[in-house]
C-alpha cells in the first residue's frame, strides 16, 4: 500500500529510494505540512512510485520547495552476524554492530544509524557471506 509524503523537488524522481530519517530541523514543528512530511516510519527504506504535480513551500530543502510523492516501503538489505537463527523466513531483532572499522566498505549496512533499535524484521532472503575485516562471520540479508 502506498503512502503520500513530501520530498525536496530535486530529489522527487520515480524509482528513487531513500531511508526516512525524521525531521531535519526544529522549525518543522511550526509547519502546517509536518503531518504529511513525517507520516513515514523513521529508519525504513522507501521507493518513490509517483511524483504528483503539487509543489509546496519548504524552508528546509534547497530551492525551498517540496513535491508531493507516493511511496512504498522498499526491500532493505542489512548485514547481520551469523547465528543459527539466520535463515529465510525467520524473525530476528535487528541491532547495530557498532563497528569502529571506519574504512570498511560495509560499515553503513553493519552500523544501522538510521534504524530505531531494536527492530524486528523477517528475513526474506540470505544474499551471501560478507567479508569482515574484523573477522566476524557476517551475512547480507534482505528483509
UniProtKB/Swiss-Prot annotation:
Pfam family, one: UPF0179
Top-level lineage group: Archaea
InterPro entries in UniProt: UPF0179
Recorded family membership: Belongs to the UPF0179 family.
PANTHER family named in the record: UPF0179 PROTEIN MJ1627
Name used for this protein in its record: UPF0179 protein PTO0851
Organism the protein comes from: Picrophilus torridus (strain ATCC 700027 / DSM 9790 / JCM 10055 / NBRC 100828 / KAW 2/3)
Amino acid at each position: 500500500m502506498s503512502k503520500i509524503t513530501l520530498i525536496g523537488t530535486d530529489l522527487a524522481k520515480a524509482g528513487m529510494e531513500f531511508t526516512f530519517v525524521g525531521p531535519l530541523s526544529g522549525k518543522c514543528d511550526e509547519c502546517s505540512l509536518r503531518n504529511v512530511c513525517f507520516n513515514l516510519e523513521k529508519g525504513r527504506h522507501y521507493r518513490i512510485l509517483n511524483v504528483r504535480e503539487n509543489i509546496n513551500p519548504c524552508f528546509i530543502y534547497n530551492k525551498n520547495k517540496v513535491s508531493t510523492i507516493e511511496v512504498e516501503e522498499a526491500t532493505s538489505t542489512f548485514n547481520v552476524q551469523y547465528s543459527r537463527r539466520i535463515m529465510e523466513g525467520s524473525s530476528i531483532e535487528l541491532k547495530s554492530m557498532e563497528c569502529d572499522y571506519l574504512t570498511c566498505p560495509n560499515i553503513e549496512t553493519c552500523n544501522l544509524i538510521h534504524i530505531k533499535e531494536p527492530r524486528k524484521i523477517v528475513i526474506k532472503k540470505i544474499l551471501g557471506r560478507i567479508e569482515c575485516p574484523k573477522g566476524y562471520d557476517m551475512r547480507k540479508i534482505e528483509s
